[in-house]
């Protein structure tokens, strides 16, 4: 039956002949082309132009005949018809040359003009901007491209001004090109239309040049811009001084205003934007918006009929492939253009896409559509149903009131799925895309849409509707959608469907109406067409000719153009006076203080108007009495929920009304007449008394601080920011399950509409910072991947929610695991168990992955070098059992399942490791570690006398290849403490860093690594741990700090005076008795609060006291350090909460556990503090937060106002942006850095971790930092030689009181052969020296405490080891024997010829120098005798020297005996042995002696047998001490190496 009715309707509309034009058929001319898609037409003419492959053709008879334009010789890239002279002038741009052609006579003649482009290119894409009045003034823009690597590469854009081609002048910025091209280059005439109020000098031109430089190392950008103005048609330009130090992103020129957008942060292209407004192009003012604006849809900015600016604001898409439109908000200014407020009809303050259309020819009329960003997934088709309804509305009073689009169509009422007589529930829903190019008419318009309640929008069900009363009521005209346009001011309507039927056939006919849509005729086309474009030949819609373009359905597509002419309809008859009727705009209501009436053709009149729209009669009758619709709120006021104008104290602070007032209050009228309103008799407006005593005065910095208050009936229990630089989005949840979303740091907050479903939990994705998941109480999960701008609703598996957190893949955003309960009618049922459900499509579908799983990790995405990228590990707890096992799989447990451990306590991942706690005998724990998912190694904890059973441990995180772990040694409730341990690089071997470190019953530890700085850790220790362990005393906590990753610890140095300038009670030189102590991690209300900030380098706040121990929290004060913990200052008495902003450029404190109305803030790194009153009544501030990166200038306070009834829970957003004069200047090249300088932290100018590091700090407190990644630009000045500070004790070694690493008594060092198991390719290993290098250290050379001694072969690699170190004995033996033979022959020859035949050795002492008794018969004899004499001489000298030395030694020994009575004192070696020797024996005693590692050589280089023991005992103690190179702070060698030391020192001398 329904099908029959639909067919009947189609027959009624399409097949009934037109009674008023029965014989008429429009004139249709077809043009075919294979090379051109579009054809250009001149206004109100039959002249068409098209470009073929090698020529340009023109037709003067609507396409019937074509001829080639001989003047145009090159291939044409594009045509542009002058929008102000569309009947005559057009431009044709050449593709391969900087050249274009101009016609001023509708194409009859053409003249060429060549652009003097400064750079060569292979392709040119140019366009032109013409002046609305001065015909000869042109602006030419050309984009240059060149061929590179068989593709086109963008070269840049050049802009020229010209006086009709007589001369060209290039417009360039002063800063020139950067990185090859300027990213933005644009110029426009200030006078954008003939009726523009701007441009007193019609030749004025505004130009913007902008360059965006990308910093690859940090991923950030630096923007630079220049906004220039010409008052002489482009001959000279001057920069607008107001924007000299700002980054101008874009501008827009309207009829009454020029809008300029400046970027708040030049180092963040996604930063918020300031909107500058001018109506004279000489002075600009910053417009006031409800919140900071980030993304403005510049192409959609327009002005309404009273000059108000309509400003569409959008979000930036995170996913370019998203099929959802960008979220948006529409702001409308006041009539001055300086205060913007959001459109006031959006349902439930929801987020969504808002489209606002304003037909300029209908005064006061707005159309608006809202598309919510909440989609529902039914697991079969994505986004199939929406939970939040769409809304489509119309306003005829400038947006003051809005109504639904009412459908009035009795004939078709059965075709709609709802009752159209009830428009509040059944109305026309549309997106108004079609209204953007709507032709002017007197209230006649067409639109595509559906009829419904907004709960579903199926694009396939769209139909076409018509209205004759400017959109108030609508009627169905076509059961399909397609292209449509109007002519003769709505008296001719053309329509062609996209598809001719439900089968999708290509349309072969178009439809037309000559009675304003009442009846329709049809025309059969010669060739079916895929329609692309249907337009009137006259831009204002007053013509009777149309152009239809598209493609054929042939295998080889042909471009088709139909020229359609209705000018002969009604026998060319023009309408007379009797053919017109009055039509009242806005249903006869007053609009802008006047009633408007059009004269339009009667619907059934048999004529055409044949007039331009501007010539259509419009009667304007001012209204006698002004009403509320003629007024708007004064600048200092805003409308409340009731529509009343109430004072806004932020706006009052921005205005100057209180500065001009001499009293404590000022009278201000809350309403002002809208600028340009026509009403005659003004309303009587009563002034409002505004108190000024709490308004900051002019010149006060408080005047620039902006505070926004929001009230809630229920307490906000959860809140968290998305960690991105795109904006300051956060999600909040109150105590009854209502979620709220803000995108501006809490300044504007909207409740998240879940259709009545309460939110029970919110989870953020730790790997993808824009994603969050909201769990509903009815089994739905709300997912967002764009920081809460849009949501998809997924139905959770049919399982009970167990409240277990999701587990996410680190590499796939849409992949996560949800845990639900099966057989859980009762949570206590023995059959109730958890099931892990896997989704890979963001929740659209879930599959059951593993039964009884309670915790899983995507292990393959966590490791740096995973054994399998798809590996998943799960903790499984079987039903009816308390035992938990660890299993793994590489195919999500489809076919592969491996049991890793049969029985575990639990496991977790941190920094590329997975650590498993496994139960051991005697109720102990053992930890196993893996960094690839395949091989697990038991973590070796150090032996220590205070470590008993391994009952509990806490993983504190990992960094730079080491795991920090707290091993509990005392687990008595309220008296928990343990040892702080640190692992080696593979996480398997731990050493003790500190004893008795405080923890609480929940396993949290007073341990915090200072963010952004290497190796600085703060802990609290139980100083009386022995007595606490014996239950004799309560815990006494002390705070310690390390600057070298735990190797050395010290107490915090206290400040000399407190915040009031008084000395502290204790003043001891011993830090053990007088130091600073801070309350730590175990006492925090929110574990996200930290001492430090990763962006405020070196800064830390803490609540504590100066003394010998930590006092209770309420007795403490607030302290600050700016040098990483080296020195501290008390900044406030009493405990305070703190927060960092602008990388530490703004520090904020608020009292804790006390009601207040003020905060304290500092802009000079804590040197001075100011108070700011942020509210009238005192509140208890529960928390103060800002973005996770601490880079924003907005802070959010959560407070509770006691005894104030409804709305007692409040948030305050405090914005400090305006207190800074400018943004700090930062030069990435390092050539200029006026606002920053490099310096070390505190007095640590030496080396730390083997290098000297300097950090950037701003030098001018008047500027803000913004998104400059300062931490990325810290620099290592140099690497340093290794010192003791670069080493820590190895496994089974402990740090003794003298600073050396000693082997634990009774234990041996770690088995060096273990590394052979980890690295199978190794063939050798080394024994431990007792020291290992700190992973953070980059030192080179110097002390080598970890120096390896003799290598050992790895098990099974003995042969390779021998081959590596073996010697080629054969070759060495041959050389050695050869040398021996030569020596033997020479010795024998000298003896035989020089000694034996001269009498032998018996004559040796008788020979004298110069004696001629030697036989010399020839030259050989003489050479031999010379050798003999030389040997004799050396022998005599040596003998004589030895005898003299022997005599002198005997004499000196005799003198000493006589003086000291032969008493024998201890030598240096024996002294060191007696006083400083170590207890351990054997090889590992070397680890106690630092001097043994000083040189590059090994012990084997020292020959012990060369030094006689008796000689050492007689050696002067004084001389040895003088020769010693051992530092005073370091012990000497043990007894077993005394001779080595003495020998080495003797050789040095």
Curated annotation (Swiss-Prot):
GO CC, one annotated term: Golgi apparatus
Superkingdom, taxonomy of origin: Eukaryota
Sorted UniProt keywords: Glycoprotein, Golgi apparatus, Membrane, Nucleotide-binding, Protein transport, Receptor, Repeat, Signal, Transmembrane, Transmembrane helix, Transport
Ranges per topology, Cytoplasmic: 1391-1549
GO biological process: Golgi to endosome transport; Golgi to vacuole transport; protein targeting to vacuole
Disulfide links within the chain: none
Signal peptide (UniProt feature, chain positions): 1-21
Stretches the record annotates as Disordered: 1479-1549
Chain positions of BNR repeats: 57-68, 101-112, 159-170, 228-239, 393-404, 465-476, 511-522, 740-751, 837-848, 1040-1051, 1119-1130, 1160-1171
Family annotation (Gene3D superfamilies): 2.10.70.80, 2.120.10.10, 3.30.60.270, YVTN repeat-like/Quinoprotein amine dehydrogenase (2.130.10.10)
Residue intervals annotated with topology Lumenal: 22-1369
Compositionally skewed regions (Basic and acidic residues) per UniProt: 1535-1549
Entry-linked Pfam families: Sortilin-Vps10, Sortilin_C
Membrane-protein topology: Single-pass type I membrane protein
GO molecular function per UniProt: nucleotide binding; signal sequence binding
Membrane-spanning residues: 1370-1390
Record field: compositional bias (Polar residues): 1489-1501
Purpose: Functions as a sorting receptor in the Golgi compartment required for the intracellular sorting and delivery of soluble vacuolar proteins, like carboxypeptidase Y (CPY) and proteinase A.
Note: Present with 279 molecules/cell in log phase SD medium.
Family: Belongs to the VPS10-related sortilin family.
Record protein name field: VPS10 homolog 2
Gene: VTH2
